[in-house]
Design a protein with these regions (language model features):
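Long, low-complexity repetitive segments of secreted extracellular proteins
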Residues: 10, 16-17, 30-34
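Extended, EK/Q-rich alpha-helical coiled-coil segments that serve as long dimerization/scaffolding arms
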Residues: 32-42
């Protein structure tokens, strides 16, 4: 995301410079040094939503895996919600809810009835009164979700490696552009400060003499200064 942000700044500065009217300036070479990569920037920005969030559309494979995960999770929840509402099963539960333990969907079974709900125990409450059981009916589906999650992580890693390779391929011009952008940023900051302070470039004489006319220290608030005419 930081790389995409830098590439976006290269493009914004290039657009701003190209749309402004000005004579030739000593800073022109800095703007000419910028090398925007709008295609790569757009790919990164649309794929990586946040440091820990990859868009479904980052790749066809990732999109398909997430659809499978979503469909399987819905199927599991539907089956478990039907189970917890069932009168024959609900009497063995502490409450009629579906929760997660160790990445698997479970139901809270009263410890004295742990043998009445067939499945795998994944956790026990701090009081020991509740065991969290993964019902046998959804064990296989839960296992599929874990498999899909592992494949999802592998696909995300592949996408990141591919982006890294693309950025590495433009590393020399990226570094050059980045340094130019920093220099431009410093110059713009100086220009803004000069405008805020109503400062101007002094005229330098060749005889080593100088006159300070209405001069003031730039770090002292102008409102605190009384300058006699």
């Amino acid at each position: 995301l930081m790389v995409a942000g830098a590439l976006r700044n290269f493009q914004n500065l290039t657009n701003w410079y190209g749309s402004s009217e000005h004579d030739m300036l000593p800073t022109d070479d800095l703007f000419y040094a910028l090398s925007p990569e709008p295609g790569l920037e757009q790919q990164i920005s649309s794929a990586i939503l946040a440091p820990d969030a990859m868009a479904d559309t980052a790749s066809r494979t990732l999109n398909e895996l997430r659809k499978k995960i979503h469909a399987t999770e819905n199927s599991i929840r539907d089956r478990l919600e039907t189970m917890v509402r069932n009168m024959d099963t609900s009497k063995y539960l502490q409450e009629s809810v579906v929760s997660m333990r160790n990445g698997r969907y479970v139901v809270p079974v009263k410890s004295e009835y742990r043998g009445e709900v067939s499945g795998i125990i994944h956790d026990v409450s701090s009081t020991g009164a509740t065991v969290f059981v993964e019902p046998q009916a959804v064990v296989e589906a839960n296992a599929r979700i874990l498999q899909y999650r592992a494949q999802e992580a592998q696909e995300i890693e592949r996408i990141l490696v591919a982006f890294t390779a693309q950025v590495a391929a433009i590393e020399p011009q990226f570094q050059y552009s980045y340094k130019a952008m920093l220099e431009i940023d410093v110059l713009l900051a100086k220009a803004r400060l000069a405008l805020d302070m109503k400062a101007f470039k002094p005229a330098v004489r060749t005889d080593s003499s100088f006159s300070l006319i209405r001069a003031r220290h730039p770090l002292i608030d102008l409102s605190l200064i009384h300058i006699s005419e």
